[in-house]
Amino acid sequence: MLSPTHIGKFGGPSMPPEWLLKGFSASIAGSSAQAPRPLHQRGDRSKLRIANFVGLSGPSGIWGPASINSSLLAASEINRRGGILGREIEIAFHDTGGDLDDVTQTASDLVASEGADIITGSHISAVRVALRKVVAGHIPYLYTPVYEGGERTPGVMAIGETPGTQWRPAIEWLTNSKRAQRWYLIGSDYVWPWLSHKAIKKYIKDAGGHVLGEEFVPIGEHDHSRQLARIRAAKPDVVLITLIGADSIVFNRAFAEQGLGSRMLRLAGAMDETVLLGIGADNTDGLYCASGYFIDMATRANDIFRDQYQASFGRHAPPPGSIGQSNYEGLRFLETVASRAGSLAIKPLLSAAANVEYQGARGRIDIRRGNARMPIYLAAANGLDFRLIKQF
């Protein structure tokens, strides 16, 4: 039986909007979250109470169900091994897709009331930047997905892909293999695309290419006609995309529907099988993605993870792509670091986390000076799946 859970005041995982699933019959149900129940107080040392802040609504809400499932699976496995430092994991999920002030107030209330021992999450970086202001120095905070790098806030641990490992080799490969020289950048208007683009422009220049244009689009924007007109006029070899979640789906659909898919390549970052499903098989020609995880990775660690995921949530559960699956990685990382530190206090935990090796569905991951080192894969969209073509 999976670990006890609680859905925070923002509610449980919602279905995506009807337009997102138009033409598809695959279910995104499959979360095994139980009915809400009060969590134990922090004074109960037999329980380790984790508050997982995850997108359950808004553009990042498409990853919510798989994020919940991946968290529950990791917690169940760890609890069967005796928990973390002998403490059974309990998870409370809180939505980050709504008003940012409400999200930070929830975190602040948890800290003030001793309502959680640890905060984790696979939310967007804008949420991380806000949460660390109220969490840092009080309880440990573990951030799991791809991000812009450079997180050094005391008490905050980040284990996702960063621009140097994710983007640089993919840009070099497209330059050498596809003769890509002319690039156009488009991303959501928040910190991950801002800082990632700064690094990406250097990588493109180093590879001998040049950037024709750059755009940042408000989160939740559904009309990309002006951006697409400018892209069409610029005639780039590659459009590099850092749009988030459902926003990426809308853009990529419109991109293909306007016939641009046959004229230029696309390279995306926060792209996984969930997003690919939303884009649709007919709209993915020339679409590449660089990531530390794909569902079809042919490794023993991933085979075990996929088998356990399907056994726990069923064949039609939401696919655990890179964003959702990072929640599984996070708890596996926490288990290793806590065991090494012998404590869940911030100082020893952070000391142990700075240089450590752990095993997850991605295989062996090395953390050195707080930065995750992992194999990065370049994949090409093939209908509703990704075909892995290169490991860096």
Where are these regions (language model features)?
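Extracytoplasmic "Venus flytrap"
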Residues: 38-47, 51-72, 94, 100, ...
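Signal peptide-proximal N-terminal region
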Residues: 70-91
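Hinge/beta->alpha junction and helix N-cap segments in small-molecule ligand-binding domains
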Residues: 92-100, 145-149, 160-167, 187-196, ...
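Short, well-structured alpha-helical segments in soluble
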Residues: 93, 97-117, 173, 222-235
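Extracytoplasmic ligand/sensor domains, especially the bilobed periplasmic-binding protein
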Residues: 116-212, 263-268, 274-281
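Hydrophobic alpha-helical
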Residues: 125-130, 236-258, 381
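Extracellular/periplasmic periplasmic-binding protein-like sensory domains
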Residues: 255-326
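Segments of small-molecule ligand-sensing domains
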Residues: 312-324, 335-387
